[in-house]
Each structure stands twice: as C-alpha cells, then as structure tokens.
Amino acid sequence: KSTLMNLLGCLDTPTRGRYLLEGVDVADYRDDELAEIRATRLGFVFQSFNLLPRATVLRNVVLPLIYTACPRKERELRAHAALRSVSLDERLYDHRSNELSGGQMQRVAIARALVNDPALILADEPTGNLDTATGDMVLNTFKRLRDAGKTIVLITHEPDVAAHADRVVHIRDGRLYEGAHGGEGARP
C-alpha cells in the first residue's frame, strides 16, 4: 500500500513499468518538477488529518498555495471555494483546527487537498479515525467530488468503504487485482 501511494504521489518512481500522470511518464521528470507536481497537481488526504493544530481552518487550507506562485488575494478566494466544496460551515473558518470534530478536521484536510485543483486526490484511510456517521459524511464529500469530475484514489481496509467506489482494486502479495477481493476470479 505504501509503495503504491508513494508511486502515485510522485514520491518514488517505478523500478519497472511506467506511471503516466496526465499522459506523461513521471520517470521523465526531474526532482524539482516532481516537487512542483506534488504541490500543484496532487492532493493528499491522510487518516490522521495532518493539520497544523494551532492554525485556523483557513490558514491550514491556504498553506499549499503559499508554496506556489498564487497571489495572496487569490489564495483566500481559492481556500474559501475549497471549504465550500466540502460543506464546512463558514463560521468555523477562523477556528483553530484543534477545536474541530474529527469529521470537520477531515473535511478541512480534503479542502486543503483540493485547493490547488489537483488532477488526482490520494486519500489514505480517510475514514479510519472517524465514527460511522462521520465517515459516511466524508464518503459523501468524496462522492460529490467524483460527480464533479475529480479522480480519487482511496486506500482502505474496510469493505463497506470500498463499496462506495466505482472501481475496486485489491493489493495481494504486492500485486494489484481488480474484482473478487484479489482471490479466485480476480484479474491482475
């Protein structure tokens, strides 16, 4: 799982085969170009949220834009748009992230992943630290994003979470399989 996420997130390059992101083999990029891709074309959502606890919601979402050439005024506009897309109450934008519930923190993390309008969103166990109702709310957020045309790779060990996906791929013994839980009848 970690190797797959590192490859998809352009943190590593394959030793065999090719990984095309937006039609280009990532092995053709220099390290500085890969860093730019990670900052602008990929969105990361983590199980543990990875928010700055004493920073406001808005500051946490703006953070990725600071590392790009995005003008200061546009940063806040884009952060507000990303937060609206995950249905977070505007009254929470000035709250510190450590004052939020788990579901609210995960929606802030998703908004942060969206703020650069990424080609690909990588979500590693995004419901793992949440209760069922809050997890369903996060999955509904991903469904809305998918319906809006976003590509999402969601890693999970939970079959009920995987059931929300349009396509399910299993990892078994280091190989990827589509369908049938990587067992009998699965296709590599």
Kindly label every feature range from the protein language model:
Residues 9:
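Helix-to-loop junction immediately C-terminal to a conserved catalytic motif
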Residues 17-25:
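Conserved ABC transporter NBD signature motif
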Residues 24-25, 73-91:
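Conserved ABC ATPase "signature" region
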Residues 55-63:
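Short coil-to-helix segment of the ABC ATPase nucleotide-binding domain corresponding to the Q-loop/switch region
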Residues 96-100, 104-105:
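Conserved ABC ATPase signature
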Residues 117:
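Conserved catalytic motifs of ABC-family nucleotide-binding domains
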Residues 121-124:
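Catalytic Walker B motif of ABC-type/P-loop ATPase nucleotide-binding domains
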